[in-house]
């Protein structure tokens, strides 16, 4: 009897350890590189702990890539930070506003759900890495890449030169794919399982984010000639402003496709009346949780205490933002520049004005 009980306790303990370790794998993410400053390779101190062993949230494959490309890690962190900031900007007027909760899981349990919001977060963070690494190549910060070697566009006028130092989007795309997707490709879940569906979802959204940066990159040119006559132009490939990438992905979020896993272990549309998603589209497998109220299980932070716009009928309006709970009004001082004048030559001088304004927060 005692032996059976001990075996039962042992089995329960092992089960709990396995479950907790799986949760830890989900919770820890390379996104945490955005939350903690990364030491640049040239700043290493003799006898200090190696860089890659200090970084939390990396999978086994990502840690190997870290060891091979240590000078890239700063820019992966910068890319993750860029993605998080853009996520917070795009969702600043939504019930879920891309809030970070800690330095390890970054977004908390809300990312355990395969929702539209999770899809956007994966896409925009992958896009951030492409953006940061591509630019670092152009600036000569990385040992394995340089200026863009993209082919001359066919529609570029013959008398325009092609060959300025452009952003190396090809390299940024390839490296981001290897690094960001490494965690997903290491997983070996049973084909057709819920976990397998989530892995496929993550890979699709990572690719959509990378493709957004790749496809939005455009040709930039500079004029040469006497007195700016522009008798000659030099052109190169340039990244789009990341705000444009964020807006593009936000549109993809609004039109994201609901998917499910089929018997063959592939994602398929829940509603066959819609066109299947392309490589540039976002997909999700779970409905979004209720973001109105705080919920420890789903990771929702709720909207209590959020600022709202009393006169707006949109998502930032008090009626929708506060989920019908009502709102409180208070007065606060607003400081801003005013009475600005241009002085010759050449600066603008402003006064600092203070006004008392009404603000509204959700109950």
Swiss-Prot record:
**Phenotype of gene-disrupted mutants:** Morpholino knockdown results in convergent extension movement defects during gastrulation and an absence of myod1 expression in the majority of hypaxial muscle precursor cells.
What does the UniProt keyword field contain?
Developmental protein, Disulfide bond, Extracellular matrix, Glycoprotein, Lipoprotein, Secreted, Signal, Wnt signaling pathway
Bridged cysteine pairs (disulfide): 87-98, 137-145, 147-165, 221-235, 223-230, 292-323, 308-318, 322-362, 338-353, 340-350, 345-346
* PTM statement from Swiss-Prot or TrEMBL: Palmitoleoylation is required for efficient binding to frizzled receptors. Depalmitoleoylation leads to Wnt signaling pathway inhibition.
Q: Which Gene3D superfamilies match?
A: 3.30.2460.20
User: Which interval of the chain is the signal sequence?
Assistant: 1-21
Question: Tell me, which GO biological process terms does this entry list?
Answer: ameboidal-type cell migration; angiogenesis; canonical Wnt signaling pathway; cartilage morphogenesis; cell fate commitment; cell migration involved in gastrulation; chondrocyte differentiation; convergent extension
Pfam families (alphabetical): wnt
Lipid-bearing positions (O-palmitoleoyl serine)? 227
GO annotations of cellular component type: extracellular space
The family database entries (PANTHER family) matched by this protein are listed as:
PROTEIN WNT-5B (PTHR12027:SF87), WNT RELATED (PTHR12027)
What is stated as this protein's family in its record? Belongs to the Wnt family.
Q: What is this protein called in UniProt? A: Protein Wnt-5b
Source organism: Danio rerio (Zebrafish)
Phylogenetic classification of the source organism: Eukaryota, Metazoa, Chordata, Craniata, Vertebrata
Gene it is expressed from: wnt5b
